[in-house]
């Protein structure tokens, strides 16, 4: 009984000192809400993440080799957040964002905030200010490797700057993490891969910017290009594999494959065909695909073409796939589900 009184007294003192809600029992009727998620634009990846997308109010890291689809995936997330009326910002440290490509993926350029900072400190200060404002829902930093410390920029070429970027990232993570949670703003860091020297056994790959981001990120996605999609002799896209390397909100280590078509982004209809067959929603007999009593095409490309031409059927298939995985039917506020992009 004395312990219960002592605990009650301690809780009351903490609430007086730090405000109501600063400490509470997790299962009690409290303002702790279910984790909100924003769709990635890929139905398969939404399912693999376990909550229907990337969690809001968290730090996310997306890394992979060059031209693997890192920026494409993040632009799809931006487009999905904008569909829900969210405010998005893109911190383009690489100075390489293609506005026309972003527009093709569904990004509203008129509503997108963009910054092209000169130094790493400036970039992270901009991120911190936007997060603390509480008015921004999603911030993308492209990329961690391009967040060059001011001391390195002002120094001579060839000067040794041991660990300066890692120190910068470590300080930024400590400063950002609390305000990101309070403002419910998602911050996505795109990262590049480097090779460790002298690794005989194990994976020699590592990401730039030290270890701080690995610890603070709630979700880490490893994205890789696995093959080419050809139309006769022309390469028209890539098959892409994403592995959920770390996930604090659902079981990790799930993998998903989807197509990224050049100039169009993630092929949603291709995913509906593949995931529909896996979920038993779409039947495959030989090379023929059918939905219900209706044949939708001979061969995968013809089935994709049918779904592009029949968005109602595609919407029904998507709803049934989501339902089979226990996900919400729609990710938009209008309750009509995601818009199908012709891909």
Curated annotation (Swiss-Prot):
GO terms for molecular function: ATP binding; ATP hydrolysis activity; ATP-dependent DNA damage sensor activity; damaged DNA binding; single-stranded DNA binding. GO terms for biological process: DNA recombination; DNA repair; SOS response. It comes from the Bacteria. ATP binds at residues 64-71. Keywords: ATP-binding, Cytoplasm, DNA damage, DNA recombination, DNA repair, DNA-binding, Nucleotide-binding, SOS response. Can catalyze the hydrolysis of ATP in the presence of single-stranded DNA, the ATP-dependent uptake of single-stranded DNA by duplex DNA, and the ATP-dependent hybridization of homologous single-stranded DNAs. It interacts with LexA causing its activation and leading to its autocatalytic cleavage. HAMAP family: RecA. This is Protein RecA. It comes from Cereibacter sphaeroides (strain ATCC 17023 / DSM 158 / JCM 6121 / CCUG 31486 / LMG 2827 / NBRC 12203 / NCIMB 8253 / ATH 2.4.1.) (Rhodobacter sphaeroides).
